[in-house]
């Protein structure tokens, strides 16, 4: 991991003194563009945590931070999601969106989770537009445990986007399969 965001929450649950912690060894292995991506990604977390109390599902947090980091780079989805698409070709599409537990993986497995999350957020932005996804983030962010965030996201998907987790998951699986050139079954 090249960097992470950390800091204490204030009385209202919003971050009051976040900082981006950089590990110089992994950062030194990145290209200039890679370093810019990492700093942008972490800056999204700082901004999110300063303005919204609590947390959203990890797929939304990490997928959106990656989306902002990659926006404007001109990289193709197949390049951005290389590890995730290799996993789809090998194992088929995942049965569910990335979870807190799946983000505890190491190596290429964790990269796949970030990339799967990016594909999901990229798909939602393509379908609904960035303003709606910003609304989704606000409504889906809640104080409490990760399961509370998942329930808040389910409610936000319905109220903000007029869809359900099942519909979003199905569209995401189809998108992964299409990008991987693989059938959408597992």
Language-model segments: residues:
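Active-site scaffold of zinc-dependent metalloenzymes
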Residues: 2-36, 40-50
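Acidic/His/Gly-enriched intrinsically disordered linker/tail segments
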Residues: 12-17, 34, 38, 52-186
């Amino acid at each position: 991991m090249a960097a992470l965001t950390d800091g204490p929450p204030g009385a209202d649950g919003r971050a009051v003194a976040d900082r981006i912690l950089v590990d110089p060894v992994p950062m030194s292995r990145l290209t200039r563009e890679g370093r810019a991506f990492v700093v942008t990604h972490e800056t999204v977390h700082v901004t999110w945590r300063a303005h919204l109390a609590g947390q959203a599902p990890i797929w939304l947090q990490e997928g959106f931070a990656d989306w902002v980091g990659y926006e404007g780079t001109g990289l193709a989805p197949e390049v951005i999601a290389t590890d995730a698409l290799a996993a789809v070709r090998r194992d088929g599409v995942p049965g569910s969106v990335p979870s807190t537990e799946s983000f505890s993986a190491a190596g290429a497995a964790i990269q796949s989770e970030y990339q799967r999350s990016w594909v999901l957020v990229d798909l939602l932005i393509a379908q609904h537009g960035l303003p709606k996804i910003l609304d989704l983030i606000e409504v889906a962010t809640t104080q409490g445990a990760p399961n509370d965030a998942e329930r808040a996201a389910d409610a936000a998907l319905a109220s903000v986007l007029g869809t359900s987790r099942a519909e979003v998951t199905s569209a995401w699986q189809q998108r992964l399969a299409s990008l991987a050139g693989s059938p959408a079954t597992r």
